[in-house]
């Protein structure tokens, strides 16, 4: 994965590209900068709302921060997006995450 600074150069070159924001979210999460990571994932979703894996990442971060209700809502939104775009792998992974999170309540 490129460094945060390299990803930010890509975002500066094309701020409308949702993948750059998603990559930034992944890197920030790796660096344990969870709030900033969520912001980057949301920026990615503002550019393309049909990204189930951005929702997956947000749900996982929220769950790790103890925000179960919000995590479940994010996972359900991702599942809805995965289903509507016909992505069976993302649907399966998000469905499993919803079940896991609901079981943790």
Annotated model-derived regions:
Residues 9-10, 43-44, 78:
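Canonical positions in the second alpha-helix
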């Amino acid at each position: 994965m490129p460094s945060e600074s390299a990803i930010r150069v890509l975002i500066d070159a094309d701020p409308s590209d949702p993948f750059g924001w998603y990559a930034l979210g992944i890197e920030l999460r790796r660096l344990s900068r969870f709030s900033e990571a969520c912001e980057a994932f949301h920026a990615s979703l503002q550019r393309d709302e049909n990204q189930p894996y951005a929702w997956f990442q947000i749900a996982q971060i929220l769950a790790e921060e103890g925000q179960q209700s919000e995590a479940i809502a994010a996972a359900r939104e991702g599942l809805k997006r995965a289903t509507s775009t016909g992505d069976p792998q993302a649907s399966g992974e998000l469905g499993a995450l919803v079940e896991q999170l609901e079981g943790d309540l």
